[in-house]
């Protein structure tokens, strides 16, 4: 579980463990009180390991799901502001997510993000062995990180051992997710080199930082969901990748932020301006808050579209070969429709 990166970490983890075991995993992000039991019921005697994702958006949801899962190991990716509308504070989110750590017994392993400030408190709540993994801290770390549109390469550090690894997606936050998966693999006896093979071959759930090229224009499709933390991470990835042309961000609304909604959207716009995005298009009323904040922070080319179709029309007019365009928003914002409309307009190209 975690505020961000649950599904990608699950995919990496299943692939890493699949180097040694017959693995079943949650399909997509079917991770709630209906999805988790259904996934478990679909497990057969052929499977040796299950990798199950647990989600929540209200208090009291993780503990009963953790009891159903009865995990031998647990991963908590991070604590952010996703679902803060229903939880109130990050501290409340940490308390809720930490229920998964409490469900692991003394023979098990709890894997935490060494770079997340809430991990120290969560670690105190479990009887299990705690393993910390992070880009900058922990017993598993990453160094010599290189990124391109086709993915990331980095060196895994574990004590005195080093191993080069590759991911099919870019983004430092994806490297972090991968390290958590490697920690799970090591906890189950998978060799470090085999963990790296698992990362390189992991089939990832769609719309998570996928590169799609349409007539020379590259789209960074991260449209599945969004919150302020994941938006900022995606914007950083956009700016870290090489592009022959401009870097453009097309951003939709972020749901379930409650009282933090206005400020959360403003922070994303301010981050886009600070990073030096060439152009930003915000979609809808809340997307307009993003673009307005970006313009106020100094990003001159910051526009608002009333709908995904209007955003697509703007891109059709301005996009040129070599441009790299980030597409991101909450699930209900359907920002992926921008890519489909752009593809249809550009000579019926297929995505």
Task: List where the protein language model places each region.
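Glycine-rich phosphate-binding loops of nucleotide-dependent enzymes
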Residues: 66, 73-74, 202, 308, ...
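Active-site beta-alpha connecting loops in nucleotide-dependent enzymes
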Residues: 204-205, 223-299, 304, 348-351
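Peripheral docking tails and interdomain loops at the edges
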Residues: 304-306, 320-343
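Acidic, Mg2+-coordinating active-site environments of NTP-dependent enzymes
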Residues: 73-219, 244-245, 270-273, 277-279, ...
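Phosphate-binding loop of NTP-binding sites
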Residues: 1-109, 114, 118-126, 317, ...
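Conserved RecA-like helicase motor-core motifs
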Residues: 21-28, 133-134, 300-303
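Short SAM/SAH-binding signature in class I
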Residues: 49, 73, 180, 320-328
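ATP-dependent carboxylate/acyl-activation modules
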Residues: 206-208, 335-340, 349-351
């Amino acid at each position: 579980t975690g505020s961000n990166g649950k599904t990608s970490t699950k995919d990496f983890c299943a692939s890493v463990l699949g180097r040694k075991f017959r693995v079943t995993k949650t399909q997509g992000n079917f991770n709630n009180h209906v999805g988790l039991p259904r996934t478990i019921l679909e497990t057969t005697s052929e499977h040796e390991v299950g990798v199950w994702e647990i989600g929540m958006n209200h208090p009291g949801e993780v503990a009963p799901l953790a009891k159903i899962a009865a995990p031998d190991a647990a991963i908590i990716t991070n604590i952010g502001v996703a679902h803060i509308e229903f939880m109130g504070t990050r501290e409340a989110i940490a308390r809720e997510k930490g229920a998964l750590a409490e469900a692991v017994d003394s023979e098990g392993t709890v894997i935490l993000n060494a770079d997340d400030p809430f991990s120290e408190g969560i670690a105190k709540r479990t009887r299990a062995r705690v393993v910390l993994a992070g880009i900058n801290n922990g017993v598993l770390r990453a160094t010599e990180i290189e990124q391109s549109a086709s993915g990331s390469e980095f060196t895994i550090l574990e004590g005195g051992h080093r191993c080069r690894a590759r991911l099919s997606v870019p983004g430092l936050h994806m490297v972090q997710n991968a390290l958590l998966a490697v920690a799970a693999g090591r906890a189950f006896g998978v060799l470090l080199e085999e963990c790296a093979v698992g990362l390189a071959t992991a089939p990832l759930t769609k719309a998570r930082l996928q590169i799609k090229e349409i007539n020379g224009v590259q789209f960074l499709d991260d449209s599945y969901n969004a919150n302020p933390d994941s938006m900022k991470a995606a914007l950083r990835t956009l700016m870290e990748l090489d592009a022959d042309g401009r870097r453009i961000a097309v951003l939709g609304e972020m749901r379930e932020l409650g009282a933090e909604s206005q400020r959360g959207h403003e922070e994303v716009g301010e981050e886009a301006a600070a990073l030096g995005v060439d152009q930003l298009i915000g979609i809808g009323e809340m997307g307009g808050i993003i673009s307005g904040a970006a313009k106020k922070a100094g990003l001159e080319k910051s526009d608002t579209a009333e709908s995904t179709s209007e955003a697509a029309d703007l891109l059709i007019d301005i996009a040129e070969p070599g441009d790299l365009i980030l597409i991101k928003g909450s699930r209900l914002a359907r920002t992926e429709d921008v890519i489909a409309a752009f593809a249809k307009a550009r000579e019926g190209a297929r995505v």
